[in-house]
């Protein structure tokens, strides 16, 4: 049955409208429980993100955002969007609103982009998104390393998305990444919770979640032994590392998101590395 919904892809003017922005913030806060300070980090970036909404009686009741993204496979780059912060008020759920929005976005983007990507908020949602053609094509490796250094090596914090992306592109061959502007938004979100990228030496850049999780080490596969040595010389206790490849015997490969591949080429890559998740 075709739903007769007030579906909107918000225009640039609408994304600058105070009432519209307040409704988006209210929906996010109600569904996800985040603080207004955190949610408001999105506002300056709204002009560069697509926002799909359903309205009932003039009120936004369901919405999600598409963040500009890329996938690198070898020397080739594919243009796409990352589906983010899908939310519907509880009293409006089970009406097909979110499914309708996703299908509309797919129709809008299938001839414009190479892919749409997303990371389900929990494992139970993988089957939901598979209905729309999304496949489990993103992964990362988790490794636990015991370190015994008495040092806590410091580094220079990086806050520029373009620099972070440049480092990632030069070291990783198969990866999902946000565009520079979207990465700046992601960095502001990480920073809100005290996480950041920092240069540890000339070649390794770490995103430290809580000084016990190295959320990402930017290093080429041939440099993995040097990277492990850097960790052991810099931290004490057990450190969890996420990376695009196995770095020792206890590395565990994990699924980390889905791709709707309009290009029909990404699924032949064997999967791409995904780490910088926003949900």
Task: Identify the function of each model-found stretch.
Residues 102, 109-121, 235-245:
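Conserved GNAT acetyl-CoA-binding A-motif
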Residues 78-90, 211-222:
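Conserved acetyl-CoA binding element of GNAT-fold acetyltransferases
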Residues 135-224:
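Amide-forming acyltransferase catalytic core, primarily the GNAT-like/NAT-type
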Residues 85-88, 94-107, 222-233:
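Conserved acetyl-CoA-binding loop-helix of GNAT-fold acetyltransferases
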Residues 53, 59-70, 80-87, 117, ...:
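Conserved beta-strand in the GNAT
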Residues 130-151, 215-225, 229-279:
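Active-site/acyl-donor-binding loops of N-acyltransferases
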Residues 20, 24-72, 172-196:
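Active-site rim helix/loop that mediates acceptor-substrate recognition in acyltransferases
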């Amino acid at each position: 049955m075709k739903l007769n919904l007030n579906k909107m892809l918000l225009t640039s003017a609408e994304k600058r409208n105070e009432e519209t922005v307040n409704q988006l913030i209210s929906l996010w806060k109600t569904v996800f429980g985040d603080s207004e300070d955190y949610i408001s980090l999105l506002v300056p970036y709204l002009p560069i993100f697509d926002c799909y909404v359903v309205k009932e009686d003039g009120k936004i009741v369901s919405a999600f955002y598409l963040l500009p993204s890329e996938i690198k496979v070898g020397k080739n780059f594919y243009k796409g969007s990352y589906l983010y912060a899908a939310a519907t008020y509880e009293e409006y759920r089970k009406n097909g609103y979110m499914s309708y929005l996703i299908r509309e976005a797919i129709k809008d983007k299938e001839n414009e982009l190479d892919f749409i990507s997303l990371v389900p908020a929990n494992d139970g949602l993988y089957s939901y998104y598979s209905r729309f053609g999304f496949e489990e094509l993103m992964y990362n490796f988790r490794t636990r390393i015991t370190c015994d250094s008495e040092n806590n090596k410091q580094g220079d914090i990086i806050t520029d998305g373009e620099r972070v992306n440049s480092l990632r592109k030069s070291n990783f061959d198969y990866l999902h990444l946000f565009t520079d502007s979207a990465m700046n938004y992601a960095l502001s979100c990480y920073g809100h919770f005290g996480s950041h990228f920092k240069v540890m030496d000339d070649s390794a850049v770490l995103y430290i979640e809580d000084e016990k999780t190295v959320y990402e080490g930017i290093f080429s596969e041939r440099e993995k032994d040097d990277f492990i040595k850097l960790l052991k010389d810099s931290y004490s206790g057990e450190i969890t590392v996420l990376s695009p490849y196995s770095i020792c015997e206890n590395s565990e490969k994990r699924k980390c998101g889905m791709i709707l591949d309009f290009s029909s080429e990404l699924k032949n890559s064997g999967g791409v590395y995904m780490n910088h998740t926003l949900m």
